[in-house]
Amino acid sequence: MFWLLAIFAYLLGSLSFAILLSRLTGNPDPRMSGSGNAGATNMLRLAGKKLAVLTLLGDLCKGLAPVLIAHLAGLSLQQQAWVGLYAVLGHLFPLYFRFRGGKGVATAAGMLLGLYPPAALLAIAAWALTFYLTRTSSLAALIATPLTLPLLAWQEPEALLPMSVLTLLIVWRHRGNLRDLFAGRERHF
């Protein structure tokens, strides 16, 4: 059952709402325009609030749904977390879009919401506060994601290993943003 759900999660995660919505509405491919990221923040820059919100909700749901299904199937919390990670991997490396996807932040938030809602709320609050203070989405993601690890270690240690892997993946996907942050070139809203 685990591997079936992991494959389902990867295939679901491979649906890029940013790319699909941009194609449906005649907007530029987010991988080729703006920041080059197939995610909600770049959709906000390229296509406006409505499509950005739809992208955000779609990406959240594709992280949340596999975790909830894994829970209903009776998988352990750690297995649920690994299933959720496969959804994020689908977002990062989508099968349907030549393995060029987004950075996984919204999909990871959906995954975390399904695993342990208090950690998701902590991450969302940290992201919102950091974004409010800095107007920099990448910095907000880089602060919010690792902040969940101590809470998970304390409350849900079974999920710590998959969430640590997730954190490393998100930091790795933001490596260009980190270079730009340190060089003072990162984009702000």
Curated annotation (Swiss-Prot):
One of its GO terms (biological process) is phospholipid biosynthetic process. Keywords: Cell inner membrane, Cell membrane, Lipid biosynthesis, Lipid metabolism, Membrane, Phospholipid biosynthesis, Phospholipid metabolism, Transferase, Transmembrane, Transmembrane helix. It is an enzyme of class 2 (transferase). The keyword Lipid biosynthesis applies. It is a multi-pass membrane protein. Its EC number is 2.3.1.275. Pfam families: G3P_acyltransf. Disulfide bonds: none annotated. GO terms for cellular component: plasma membrane. The keyword Amino-acid biosynthesis does not apply. Pathway: Lipid metabolism; phospholipid metabolism. It catalyses: an acyl phosphate + sn-glycerol 3-phosphate = a 1-acyl-sn-glycero-3-phosphate + phosphate. InterPro entries: G3P_acylTferase_PlsY (IPR003811). Signal peptide: none annotated. One of its GO terms (molecular function) is acyl-phosphate glycerol-3-phosphate acyltransferase activity. Its main location: membrane. The chain crosses the membrane at residues 1-21, 51-71, 77-97, 111-131, 151-171. It is found in: Cell inner membrane. PANTHER family: GLYCEROL-3-PHOSPHATE ACYLTRANSFERASE-RELATED (PTHR30309:SF0), INNER MEMBRANE PROTEIN YGIH (PTHR30309). Probably interacts with PlsX. Catalyzes the transfer of an acyl group from acyl-phosphate (acyl-PO(4)) to glycerol-3-phosphate (G3P) to form lysophosphatidic acid (LPA). This enzyme utilizes acyl-phosphate as fatty acyl donor, but not acyl-CoA or acyl-ACP. Belongs to the PlsY family. This is Glycerol-3-phosphate acyltransferase. It comes from Pseudomonas fluorescens (strain ATCC BAA-477 / NRRL B-23932 / Pf-5). The gene is plsY.
